[in-house]
Amino acid sequence: MRLGAVFYNDFELLDAYGPLEMFGALGDQIKIVTIAEQAGPVSSSAGPKTIADYGFDDAPELDLILLPGGIGTIPELGNEAMLTFLKTRAAKSQITMSVCTGSALLAKAGLLDGLAATTNKMFFEL
C-alpha cells in the first residue's frame, strides 16, 4: 500500500508528521512518499523544510492520500495545479484524508460535496 503525503509551502508540521508517524508504525505494509507541486524542498509554517520525493507530474499511483493543514492552505485555495491534482488522484485512491484546514482544499476541489467534514472553525466560511 502506498500513502502520498501532499505538501505545500507553509504546511503545519504536526498535521503532516503526526499521522505519518502512526502510518510509519505499519512498517513494510505501507510505503510513504512525499509529493508537492514540484519535487524538492517545501517550507513548513514553522520553518523546517520537507523534501518532496515527487512533483505532481511524476507522482506514483496512490492508495492513500494525506493532506495536512496549515496557514499555507489559504493561497493554495487558488492553486489550480493543487486542486486538479487532488481531484484526479482522489478519484483513483482508496482513501483521501486531511488534517485541520487541509479539508478546505478538499472542499475547494469539490471532493467533499454532499459529505460531512470537519475543519478549523476559522475556515468555516471558506
Locate the predicted segments by residue.
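Extended, subdomain-level signal for the structured scaffold at the beginning of enzyme domains
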Residues: 1-96, 104-108, 114, 124
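Anionic-ligand binding patches
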Residues: 117
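Class I SAM-dependent methyltransferase SAM-binding "motif I" and its flanking Rossmann-like core
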Residues: 120-121
